[in-house]
Amino acid sequence: MLYHVSPVAGLKTLQPRVSTHKVGYVYAIENLVTGLLFGAKWDDFDFILSTDKNGNPVICECYPDAFKSVYQGKTCSVYFLNDEGFQRNKTSWSEELVSENKVQVVEEHVITDLYNRLLDEEQNNKLIVHRYEYCTEYRKTISNHIVDRLIRFEIDLSNISESDNRFSKYFRAIVTELIQITDGHLLP
């Protein structure tokens, strides 16, 4: 059994959607707790997501209280799916399975309090959450991650601070410095 978790309730069929992979996929996952992390909208500027040696999801907050701000007050639906037609290793994330075809939902479970459910999973050692730390090593890791994603995703640095409050609140200095070092003045 695979899982697809969404903030949208009541789906009977999942349709392929084009995302960052630029191909229409239905996304699924084997680990329910990892799936629950996708029950609210977030991206690489909120968390770094990985897995530990036991396959448990590990998230690192990219700014203070990211976990709480993303998940508190959210509900989601867990869709149970048969694994037929799903493929592994079609994306860069090994935990992710995809299907290029529409997929019938076998069952739906509604999670009415996603934040508290994830806190329970953390208490049960099924989820590791690294809250934002004000130490140099942690901040260096987050800074490197943010810079990598800004460049990799070809984000328009000139407008991002106005269009996304995370950048004006938490990442303004990184964006300002990147604009300065990428404007060409450092080259002969």
Predicted features along the sequence, with ranges:
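Conserved NAD+-utilizing ADP-ribose enzyme module
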Residues: 22, 41-188
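A broad, low-specificity signal marking well-ordered, structured residues that form hydrophobic/aromatic
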Residues: 1, 26-27, 76-79
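Extended catalytic/binding region for NAD+/ADP-ribose chemistry, centered on the ART fold
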Residues: 20-44
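Short, flexible beta-strand-to-coil junctions
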Residues: 4-10, 30, 81-86
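Short catalytic/ligand-binding loop motif for oxyanion handling, primarily in non-cytosolic enzymes
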Residues: 12, 36-37, 87-89
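ADP-ribose/NAD+-binding catalytic cleft of ART/PARP-like enzymes
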Residues: 1-23, 40
